[in-house]
Amino acid sequence: MTKTEISGIAPFFIVRNVPVALSFYRDRLGFDITFQGPTEDDIFFGIVQRDAAMIMMKEIGVDPVPNYTRDIKKGIARWDAYLHVPDPDALAAEFQSRNVEFFHQIQKNTMTKFWMV
């Protein structure tokens, strides 16, 4: 059986405020907003894209609980997504130039060309 191509995958983040999150991804991280809605008066879902990377986000009416701590027994990891980029140092410098703040310092790991965000 031949394999059908999967051309990408997009993480889905629950956020406190979709318009604010969309602005952050556009203005600070350099993404393009490709969708926000379902209407101009009721924006609770959005999609951003930068090159081949896409992120979907949704507001659910209650504050999300971030996974910035690690508790394996409870099934909680401290990261939500990995970025694969040809030049992680350049991306880190770009984010620093845009005054992006992280809970933990961006780090290289043992996998080449991957950064934890």
Task: Please describe what each predicted stretch is.
Residues 43-45, 78, 112-115:
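Short hydrophobic/aromatic beta-strand or adjacent loop that forms the aromatic wall/cage
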Residues 51-55, 61-64, 87-90:
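Short, charged/polar surface micro-motifs in flexible loops or helix N-caps
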Residues 1-5, 68-71:
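A detector for short, charged/polar N-terminal pre-domain segments
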Residues 1-4, 13, 83, 92-117:
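Vicinal oxygen chelate
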Residues 3, 12-54:
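Core segments of cupin and vicinal oxygen chelate
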Residues 23-24, 89-94:
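Short amphipathic alpha-helices within nucleic acid-binding modules
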